[in-house]
């Protein structure tokens, strides 16, 4: 058998031994971890401390395992989220180290690495907040910008955790019944703050959603206050526009939840005056949340300097999706050889850049990430994004067909499979030297995402007709060459379908549409006529429910150290390929 079995099994064995829990967060110090007792409260030291946050985005092997195929920083989390959706098949799975995650048969260990990574990242943020507060309280006004980074990053991480780990109904009766028995509904993950006493980590229950939302919003409010007047030097730091984007994400998450459940809305309202020190939300309806989402999206969109990617920027063989530009609101920053891992199969571009001679996208491995046929077929002929993936009629050609922006030779092109992605380019466009090609950044939030959030929000506040017209104008202005795109939606369901097509095309590979699938209870459909998913991965989840594999589970080892948590049902094998 090929190497994926060996690597997956070894990674699983390592995961079995993880102390990847909030109790052990006090005991574990991975590399790039900032430790408060080691850093003085002066501006230079605070800057160093705050730098640990963007640094941890691209830190790999945080657990310290020999095999870390599922432990290569935040880009790894992005990659995993997309492979759990419907648009991310691999051309050949012989070297697919994620095969048992992607086919849904063995999911728990991949979740464990996510849990461990996020909580160690949160420890970094807590350290920044702890020392930042000390400095600000001591009169150091410059420290506010670093304190704002701590609050902003912590809010982003907890918002991810909530949306990953909260159990939502799947339509699989056995799983959903088990979730009821366990008490999984309506609870999220444990909250660990900079002030949480060590002893509390060993009896730290999962926070209910109505507490978690207010906790995250409080962090965002504090970040917004701290970052007033701040101008950042790099886009791996947050400024107020990013905080507005995060608030947009959070308000839209709440809006969808409360629209679906009046009971959950009532619980949120009842928790408004809880004595926990968190800010009030000040809402009484899902409509209030949609209005807030639209408000903060507008604030983000109005921030100076942003514009949607142009065709030239998107498809640039040298800088496409590897270099920050005026579309990026937040991104990783990799600008030196010291930051890269030369084992390319433990890197994002090692899996995602098809043009290289050094990654998994070569004839040696044939592990090309492709777009799902169903989505590709929905991209209009006059949508210039269509050339981000190889048309089946152009695959195998001995010369590069017209319409594609690439520097590869005809010989290399002839090896690329149908639907193969060309979206993510190697650093500096270098296809031959991985020590150059891996020096590349990635977007974590783009202005286009927030624009789509705005369209969804106004569909609920201004009506479907207004939102459909706005979406149509935006797509024709920014993505079509001839203005031929039409959005004829007259119902909310039809509009969401149209908007999701645009989200899935625009944000392919960026690890974001997972959250929309889960938020909106959308089915993942991989089995259909002509599908390019391997037979074992042709999983179809149930309409109106969350795909089981999108409910991450807290590690059982967390409960060993922190018995107050609720470990949800294991979704492995809940739905299988037919």
Task: Mark where each language-model region is.
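Short coil/linker segments at helix-helix boundaries
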Residues: 164-214, 218, 257-295
């Amino acid at each position: 058998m090929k190497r994926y079995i060996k690597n997956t099994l070894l990674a699983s064995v390592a995961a079995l031994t993880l102390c990847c829990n909030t109790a052990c967060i006090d005991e574990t110090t991975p590399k790039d971890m900032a430790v408060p007792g080691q850093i003085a409260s002066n501006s230079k030291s605070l800057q160093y401390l705050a730098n640990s946050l963007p640094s941890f985005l691209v830190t790999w092997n945080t657990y310290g395992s020999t095999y870390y195929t599922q432990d290569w920083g935040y880009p790894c989390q992005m990659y995993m989220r997309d492979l759990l959706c419907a648009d991310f098949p691999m051309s050949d799975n012989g070297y697919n180290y994620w095969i048992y995650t992607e086919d849904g048969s063995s999911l728990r260990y991949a979740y464990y690495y996510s849990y461990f990574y996020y909580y160690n990242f949160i420890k970094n943020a807590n350290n920044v907040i702890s020392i930042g507060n000390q400095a600000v309280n001591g009169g150091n006004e410059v420290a506010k910008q670093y304190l704002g980074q701590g609050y902003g990053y912590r809010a982003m991480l907890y918002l991810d955790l909530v949306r990953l780990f909260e159990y939502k109904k799947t339509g699989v009766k056995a799983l959903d019944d088990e979730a009821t028995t366990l008490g999984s509904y309506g609870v999220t993950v444990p909250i660990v703050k900079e002030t949480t006493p060590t002893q509390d980590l060993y009896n730290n229950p999962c926070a209910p959603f109505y507490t978690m939302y207010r906790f995250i919003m409080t962090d965002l409010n504090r970040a917004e206050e701290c970052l007033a007047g701040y101008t950042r030097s790099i886009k791996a730091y947050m400024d107020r526009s990013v905080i507005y984007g995060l608030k947009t994400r959070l308000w839209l998450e709440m809006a969808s939840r409360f629209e679906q459940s009046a009971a959950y809305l009532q619980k949120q309202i009842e928790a408004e005056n809880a004595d926990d020190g968190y800010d009030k939300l000040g809402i009484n309806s899902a409509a209030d949340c949609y209005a807030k989402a639209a408000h903060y999206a507008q604030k983000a969109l109005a921030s100076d300097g942003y514009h949607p990617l142009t065709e030239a920027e998107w498809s640039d063989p040298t800088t496409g999706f590897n270099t920050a530009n005026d579309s990026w609101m937040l991104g990783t920053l990799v600008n030196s050889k010291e930051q890269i891992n030369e084992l390319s199969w433990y890197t994002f571009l090692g899996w995602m850049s098809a043009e290289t001679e050094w990654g998994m996208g070569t004839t040696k491995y044939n592990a090309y990430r492709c777009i799902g046929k169903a989505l590709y077929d929905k991209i209009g002929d006059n949508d210039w994004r269509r050339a981000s993936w190889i048309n089946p009629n152009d695959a195998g050609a001995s010369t590069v067909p017209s319409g594609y922006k690439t520097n590869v030779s005809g010989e290399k092109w002839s090896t690329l499979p149908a639907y193969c992605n060309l979206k993510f380019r190697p650093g500096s466009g270098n296809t031959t030297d991985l020590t150059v090609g891996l020096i590349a950044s990635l977007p974590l939030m783009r202005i286009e995402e927030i624009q789509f959030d705005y369209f969804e929000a106004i569909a609920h506040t201004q009506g479907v007709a207004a939102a459909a017209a706005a979406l149509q104008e935006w797509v024709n202005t920014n993505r079509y060459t001839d203005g031929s795109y039409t959005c004829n939606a007259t119902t909310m369901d039809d509009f969401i379908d149209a908007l999701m097509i645009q989200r899935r095309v625009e944000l392919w590979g960026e690890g974001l549409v997972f959250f929309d699938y889960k938020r909106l209870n959308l089915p993942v459909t991989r089995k259909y006529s002509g599908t390019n998913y391997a037979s074992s991965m042709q999983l179809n989840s149930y309409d109106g429910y969350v795909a089981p594999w999108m409910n991450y589970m807290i590690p059982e080892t967390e409960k060993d150290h922190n018995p107050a948590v609720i470990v949800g049902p294991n979704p492995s094998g809940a739905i299988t390929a037919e």
